[in-house]
Curated annotation (Swiss-Prot):
Coiled coil: none annotated. Its EC number is 2.4.-.-. Keywords: Glycosyltransferase, Transferase. This is Uncharacterized glycosyltransferase HI_0868. The lineage of its organism: Bacteria, Pseudomonadati, Pseudomonadota, Gammaproteobacteria, Pasteurellales. GO terms for molecular function: glycosyltransferase activity; hexosyltransferase activity. The keyword Thylakoid does not apply. Gene3D superfamilies: Spore Coat Polysaccharide Biosynthesis Protein SpsA, Chain A. Disulfide bonds: none annotated.
């Protein structure tokens, strides 16, 4: 049986505290036909040392560099250029995934002839202990995603051929903008499992000014990038804010 190759794209920037766990959560997958593409974005800590130690032991790991520190969008775009897989997924360097995630997600896609799927996820504390499960819609299309970003970057698995021309824009909330573009191409993403298989590490301090900046970034995506006009941009922004409030308060 042909085993599709899955490319996992991970930007790395000063991630020495949690990088090893994130990498091993990929390499220890029950589905082994993967390539892990690491893009260092100008790290000044021990991240490269950690990566080199792993590369010596596992040839599935590939390391690339940005010329200067350019942010996650540029790093992920290098990963998209270098990826050879039939399917693409992403992981941030301080997060991790369940060991059977890719096997279950890929099998679900192959059995149901799907191009793009997503899963539920959980927030964890800095030690990796689960704090809160976040559930997502069974089916997400472009209009659904406009009402609130239900994806975390590592929850999505998508057929590479279907998004081969897409890249992350160099803006804030670049992942949200990228997935909006994806859903213009593939039309919908389907939930493959109700269990959390992706784990997002969060800090213990939430800064109100960052929430205000995030709100501006989101509105700019609606108004400037999606060109929805003032009224529709305000409408979807209100839905986005409401759904975000509900998600974090449940």
């Amino acid at each position: 049986m042909n085993m599709p190759l899955i490319s996992i794209i991970m930007p790395v920037y000063n991630a020495e505290c949690y990088l090893n766990q994130g990498i091993l959560s990929c390499l220890n997958q029950s589905y082994q036909n993967i390539e892990l593409i690491l893009i260092d974005d100008g790290s000044t800590d021990k991240s490269i040392e950690i990566i080199n130690n792993i590369i010596d032991k596992d040839k599935r790991v590939k390391l690339f560099f940005t010329p200067t520190n350019q942010g996650p969008a540029a790093a992920r775009n290098i990963g998209l250029e270098k990826a050879q897989g039939d399917y693409i997924t992403f992981l941030d360097s301080d997060d991790f995934i369940a060991n059977d995630k890719l096997e279950k997600q890929l099998n679900f896609m192959l059995q149901n002839h799907l191009v793009m799927t997503h899963g539920n996820y959980a927030f964890c504390d800095l030690e990796g202990n689960q704090i809160k499960l976040v559930t997502t819609s069974k089916k997400i299309d472009y209009l659904t995603l406009l009402q609130g970003n239900q994806f975390k970057i590592m929850t999505v698995l998508v057929e590479r051929e279907s998004i081969k021309l897409l890249r992350f824009p160099n803006i804030k909330h670049e992942d949200y903008a990228f997935f909006l573009d994806c859903l213009k191409e593939v039309k919908q993403s389907i939930l493959y499992s109700h269990q959390a298989s992706s784990f997002v590490r969060i800090g213990k301090v939430s800064v109100s000014s960052n929430k205000f900046k995030s709100a501006i970034w989101t509105f700019n995506i609606y108004f400037k990038r999606e060109k929805l006009g003032v009224v529709k941009s305000i409408y979807y922004f209100i839905l986005y804010a409401y759904n975000g409030f509900i998600k974090y308060k449940k």
